[in-house]
Amino acid sequence: MIRFLTSGESHGPELTGIIEGLPSGFLVTKEYIDSFLQRRQKSLGSGGRMNIESDQVEISSGIINNLTTGGPITLKIKNNDWKNWKDKDIDPYVVPRPGHAHLVGTAKYDAKDIRLILERSSARETAMRCAIGAIAAQILENFDIHICGYVSGIGSMEYLYKGTDGIKNLQNKVTESSVSCPDDKISKEMENEIKLARKKKDTLGGSITTIASGVPA
């Protein structure tokens, strides 16, 4: 069984991930993982944190000469923003934000300072999940299994994949889009919805679609 564990706080020194259960002998490269991290950072509507971080993975165990050893794989991603927070004396955070883990987390862990919850439930944690997912994606390519995810809806705009492009061409279009939607026209309209919502200080709902090719029936 393959398992993974992540640790680290949003404004701590680093994020850490451990993966166990992967077999030995599979090609896994830092460059492939970093390409996923770079795609994660490019989307329109991302917060100011993306201007501070320049994510690159550090592989400290489980991969030697770009091959998995069969032992646990340990990954690290540095938080550049840590230096801006490490010496600050910060007052407790006591007002929960709607739609976040703040309220549930404080109830579960009996926390008096919401910062103890938000540091772990921050979207920053998904950087490590992205790196771990990249390893899985690269290993699956050995079996001619390819995966592509794209944004299929933002606000009132929706895109439905017709299946006319190969999955690699689809991924190229997704990568070129500022909103990760493979249709140029709909991408522009999604961009406009995001900009309008920002101006109104509002939020938008959205949806994603994931496609896999080569999966055995």
Question: How should each PLM-predicted stretch be described?
Answer:
Residues 1-126, 130-217:
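Generic N-terminal targeting/processing segments that precede catalytic cores or assembly contacts
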